[in-house]
Curated annotation (Swiss-Prot):
<feature type="binding site">
    <location>
        <position position="341"/>
    </location>
    <ligand>
        <name>S-adenosyl-L-methionine</name>
    </ligand>
</feature>
<keyword id="KW-0698">rRNA processing</keyword>
<feature type="binding site">
    <location>
        <position position="314"/>
    </location>
    <ligand>
        <name>S-adenosyl-L-methionine</name>
    </ligand>
</feature>
<comment type="function">
    <text>Catalyzes the formation of 5-methyl-uridine at position 1939 (m5U1939) in 23S rRNA.</text>
</comment>
<dbReference type="Pfam" id="PF01938">
    <property type="entry name" value="TRAM"/>
</dbReference>
<feature type="binding site">
    <location>
        <position position="90"/>
    </location>
    <ligand>
        <name>[4Fe-4S] cluster</name>
    </ligand>
</feature>
<keyword id="KW-0408">Iron</keyword>
<dbReference type="InterPro" id="IPR030390">
    <property type="entry name" value="MeTrfase_TrmA_AS"/>
</dbReference>
<feature type="domain" description="TRAM">
    <location>
        <begin position="10"/>
        <end position="68"/>
    </location>
</feature>
<feature type="active site" description="Nucleophile">
    <location>
        <position position="388"/>
    </location>
</feature>
<dbReference type="InterPro" id="IPR001566">
    <property type="entry name" value="23S_rRNA_MeTrfase_RlmD"/>
</dbReference>
<feature type="binding site">
    <location>
        <position position="293"/>
    </location>
    <ligand>
        <name>S-adenosyl-L-methionine</name>
    </ligand>
</feature>
<keyword id="KW-0004">4Fe-4S</keyword>
<feature type="binding site">
    <location>
        <position position="298"/>
    </location>
    <ligand>
        <name>S-adenosyl-L-methionine</name>
    </ligand>
</feature>
<keyword id="KW-0489">Methyltransferase</keyword>
<dbReference type="GO" id="GO:0070041">
    <property type="term" value="F:rRNA (uridine-C5-)-methyltransferase activity"/>
</dbReference>
<dbReference type="GO" id="GO:0070475">
    <property type="term" value="P:rRNA base methylation"/>
</dbReference>
Amino acid sequence: MAQFYSAKRRVTTRQIITVKVNDLDSFGQGVARHNGKALFIPGLLPEESAEVIITEDKKQFARARVSRRLNDSPERETPRCPHFGVCGGCQQQHVGIDLQQRSKSAALARLMKHEVNDIIAGAPWGYRRRARLSLNCPPDKPLQMGFRKAGSSDIVNVEQCPVLAPQLAALLPRIRACLASLHGTRHLGHVELVQAGSGTLMILRHTAPLSAADKEKLERFSHSEGLSLFLAPFSEILETVSGEAPWYDSHGLRLAFSPRDFIQVNEAVNQQMVARALEWLDVRAEDRVLDLFCGMGNFTLPLATRAASVVGVEGVPALVEKGRENAIRNGLHNVTFFHENLEEDVTKQPWAKNGFDKVLLDPARAGATGVMRHIIKLKPIRIVYVSCNPATLARDSEALVNAGYEVTRLAMLDMFPHTGHLESMVLFERM
């Protein structure tokens, strides 16, 4: 009879070892060396020694947790948030901001095989102008409102959040009190807060109809707090209760948006990012510029203030329409927006027949692997690639380098201080 054996699991002895950390990865984990391989230890910083317990032992690397820290790095900070270490929102509040930026820049430089020329950053606290807080009301218990625990669907009841814009952070206890007073608390899903140029927005998701009394209470609350309130009974429906249509500023232009539309979370970094893109592209009065994955025009419209003509291309029809409206609202008549499948050959479209001098693209995390060959066909002089995923950026960059482009500028965008998120932008020039 045949006998079957399962593969042996690599068993760790759980022994305590003493190590010294010599590096910090972009996720805020300390990196030491043990048995000839990298050992990742959350919570430790470079120059710190600790007694640690191995929790995972792989062929190429291992992981450990701290049993006892033996000394403190001069770059260690006291976390400002009482929920740090439990809430999944921030991972690096114990790390000095300079060290955070250096470690992210080093990780980006390794991936791109190019030095980081610029760090684009704003204030490390109070920067987040958008947040979604989960809501839950267990039977016979108070309403829970907060963010998810790290690695869990459980909610951390958040009383304060130092990375939120101050206007939003100040609202948290009053929003909690208002929502807890409703009769339909068990039907509340989440609340989104946005600090726009037009003021504060509150979007309340609920899974069953709210009573007239609850709606009236919410409307009174919105008026007393001076915020715009929107109800979302279903995923595709948005009901305006109070307030005006929101807008935000991009390089001196006013961009209207729907409360659910994507806008960059960090306003200060977004403003610098747009300005740097214009500078790197060296947009001139005679240029034709193409903006791919353009959204509602965050880059497109500022580009149109300098270029002869700009084409914005986006895969979401509602954002294309919003871009057109924003162009009209800002008196820009040299910009056109088109809805296209960006995986298809955009060079065959009528609007591309005259070519483009400069190209900007700002894709989602999946990157733009299907788009690169079409960009190469256009033979632009300069390309700026804005990325929220350094791995896909490095992959897509290879296509441009192989086609004769060279990385001439690389910037790390510190869009999300105290987290492991790493964003960047690159300038490619045709050689």
